[in-house]
Structure formats: structure tokens, C-alpha cells
Regions:
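Alpha-helical transmembrane segments of multi-pass membrane proteins predominantly involved
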Residues: 1-394
């Protein structure tokens, strides 16, 4: 006879789930309000989203460090808290753009804000867990929402961008699932701290090292796709070009924060175990990404595509710090990305401010360089701010 399973409230510790539940509840409330009354002013949904983000921000600040919850699959540590605050902070900068007079039409859909909050919850699950299954669930929740947000821009190249992103995202998810399956087959666990313990006792086994090699390659490819690292970066410029300028800026920053945190946990585990080839592979990818992305940025005819390649090169810089696997290196990643978040979101916001309804300068691109010629005469303050953002990114 099966013995009953005893579940204690202490092992649940649902307070660790509070930030994600707040975001999910906010998204459901927006959908319910739209079902009850379709004539509500759309600004209400913007303000409601901002309110949910503020509450979410406060709930993260109230979490205790070094705590586990929900049957030990949730992990609240310093990295988890700071990354959640950065994700919510970047979202709070992005959402108020919907209140301006030059907002894009997708900001008129209540579904946009509901999906946005579901995406935030997915990112938070990714950074607040060291359980491979929950990381995968968070990854797919966020990705599926983001694909839809891109398509809501409702232009032919937006649909193309969404399909490209979906295809590449599905491929990355498949690599992640296969890599995780290999790890589970080797160790019998999906919790990274348990995986590390089992691997540490079996590192001398030849067969195990071959399997570790396979799992690490699969996971490296998966996150190279997600972080748009060389040579898996080709989708990023097309997707950024098809998305609205503010959303492209958001995509270049916030989703990558979540992916970098998971990379710190995963590849830090391999490096801590003394598997040095993982470190050197990351460093080689970082150098190639930094170099080739900057070269490609030089030959672009569109400012948005140039900024897309710039974002790719910045990901290479962060991967170099990740390969160090030190407290100082991880601290520098968050400091670097906090500054990068403001400058990159600002640069993409300037593209949005200077947009035109029709392509006046180029039939192919929305933001050709010719569009910004003489900007100092038309919009002096905007030109100065744009210059500051560009110099900051250099």
C-alpha cells in the first residue's frame, strides 16, 4: 500500500512565489475587466499594469535572502532578488510609453498588457529557481508571450519577426530540454545543487565525462540562441527590425537578464567542478561575439539594426565576465547591465520619438542614417540626448 505523502507548510513557503503570483493575477484581472466591459479606456490598463509592477517590486524587496520554497524548487538568493528588481525596473521604464500621444496601436489592446505581465512572471520563475524543469516552464511562458507581443505590432515584417523568433526559440528550447534530460539521466536530479554534488563524486568516470560534454554543448547552444551569441545571432537583427522600437529596446535588455542569470547558475556549476573547457569555450564565443558583431554593426544601413548588433556585442562582454565565475565577475555583470539597460532603452526610445508614419528616406528601412541628418536643427535636445546614449554604448 502506498504511504501517504506528508506536506508541511514550511516546505511550501508560498511567500517565495508571491512576486510571480502578483504578476499572473494582474494579467488575469486585465483580461477579466476587458471581458466585463470592452469600452473601458485603454489608459486604465496601462495604469493597472504599472500598479501591478510597483506591487511586484515591493514584494521582491520583502523577500528573505538565502531561502527556499515550494518544495525547494524556488531559490531566493542575492542574484535572484537583484535580477528580479532589474527585470521589473526595466519593465516599469517601458510600460509608461503607452500613455504618450505617439503610442503604437498595440498599446490599445488589453491583451498586450496581460501578456506582458505573464512574460514578467516567466522571467521571474527563470531567475528564482535552480530547478531545470521550472526554469524551462518560465522560459517558455516568457517566450510565448513575447512572440505574441511582437506580432501585435500588426505589420508584415512584424509577423515575419515573430515567426523567426518563434522558430529560433523553439530550437533553443529543444536544445535546453535535451541537455536537461542528459543531466537528469546522469544524476537522477534536476536541482542544480544536487546535480553538482553527484557530478563531483563521479568526475573520474570516462563515460560520465562524455555525457557531461554532450549536456554542456546542448545547453551552450541553447543559451547562445537566447542571448544571440555568435554564431547563433542571425535572427536578432531581423526580429528587432520587425518589432516596434520600444519593444525592440526592451527585448535587447530584459529577456537577456533572465537568460544570463540561468547561465551563471548552469555554467558556473560546470566551471566550479573544474571542467575548464567550458570556461574556454565561453571565452572564445565571447571574443567572437564582441568582434564580429561590432564589425557587422559598421556596415548596417539602418540605425535599429545597428543597435541590434550593438546589443549582441554587449552580450559578448558579459559572457567574458561570466566565464570568470567569481563574485566580483557576477557583480560586474549586474552593474554593467543596469547601466546598459538605461542607455539601450533610451537609444531605442529616441528611435521611437523620431519615427514617421511613412518611410520618407528609404523604402526598405524605418530608421536609415539619412533620417537623423540635421537632427540638431529639428530637435536640438533630442539630438543631444541621442548623442549621449550613443557615446554611452560605444
Amino acid at each position: 500500500m502506498l504511504e501517504p505523502i506528508n506536506v508541511s507548510l514550511e516546505s511550501l513557503n508560498l511567500i517565495t512565489l508571491a512576486p510571480m503570483l502578483i504578476a499572473i493575477a494582474g494579467g488575469l484581472i486585465i483580461l477579466i475587466l476587458d471581458l466585463l466591459n470592452e469600452k473601458l479606456h485603454k489608459s486604465l490598463y496601462v495604469m493597472l499594469t504599472v500598479l501591478v509592477l510597483f506591487i511586484n517590486f515591493g514584494s521582491v524587496l520583502g523577500l528573505n535572502v538565502n531561502e527556499r520554497g515550494f518544495f525547494d524548487v524556488m531559490l531566493i538568493d542575492g542574484i535572484s532578488i537583484i535580477s528580479q528588481l532589474m527585470i521589473i525596473g526595466g519593465s516599469m521604464i517601458f510600460i509608461p510609453l503607452a500613455l504618450t500621444s505617439k503610442r503604437f496601436h498595440e498599446y490599445s489592446y488589453p491583451e498586450f498588457f496581460a501578456l506582458f505581465l505573464f512574460m514578467i512572471a516567466g522571467f521571474q520563475f527563470m531567475v528564482a529557481s535552480d530547478n531545470l524543469i521550472l526554469i524551462f516552464v518560465g522560459l517558455e511562458t516568457a517566450s510565448l508571450s513575447l512572440y505574441t507581443l511582437i506580432a501585435l505590432h500588426n505589420r508584415s515584417n512584424s509577423y515575419e519577426a515573430a515567426v523567426k523568433y518563434f522558430t529560433m526559440g523553439a530550437l533553443a528550447a529543444a536544445f535546453f530540454a535535451m541537455g536537461s534530460a542528459v543531466i537528469y539521466a546522469l544524476t537522477g536530479s534536476v536541482e542544480l545543487y544536487k546535480v553538482a554534488e553527484v557530478m563531483a563524486t563521479r568526475l573520474n568516470e570516462t563515460g560520465l565525462m562524455i555525457a557531461i560534454f554532450g549536456s554542456s554543448v546542448l545547453l551552450l547552444v541553447s543559451f547562445a540562441f537566447k542571448l544571440s551569441l555568435f554564431p547563433f545571432h542571425t535572427w536578432a537583427p531581423d526580429v528587432y527590425e520587425g518589432a516596434s522600437a520600444p519593444l525592440a529596446g526592451y527585448m535587447s535588455v530584459v529577456p537577456k537578464i533572465a537568460a544570463f542569470v540561468v547561465s551563471i547558475r548552469l555554467f558556473g556549476m560546470y566551471i566550479d567542478l573544474g571542467i575548464e573547457w567550458v570556461r574556454w569555450t565561453i571565452l572564445i564565443i565571447a571574443v567572437l561575439t564582441m568582434t564580429l558583431a561590432n564589425i557587422m554593426a559598421l556596415v548596417q544601413n539602418d540605425v535599429k539594426r545597428m543597435l541590434a548588433y550593438s546589443s549582441i556585442s554587449h552580450a559578448g562582454f558579459i559572457m567574458a565576465a561570466l566565464a570568470l565565475d567569481t563574485t566580483e565577475g557576477n557583480t560586474s555583470i549586474f552593474l554593467y547591465y543596469a547601466l546598459f539597460m538605461f542607455t539601450n532603452l533610451g537609444a531605442f526610445a529616441m528611435l521611437w520619438i523620431s519615427r514617421h508614419k511613412k518611410r520618407r528616406f528609404d523604402d526598405r528601412y524605418d530608421h536609415p542614417y539619412e533620417k537623423f541628418a540635421g537632427l540638431i536643427q529639428i530637435m536640438p535636445m533630442g539630438a543631444v540626448v541621442m548623442g549621449l546614449f550613443m557615446f554611452s554604448l560605444a
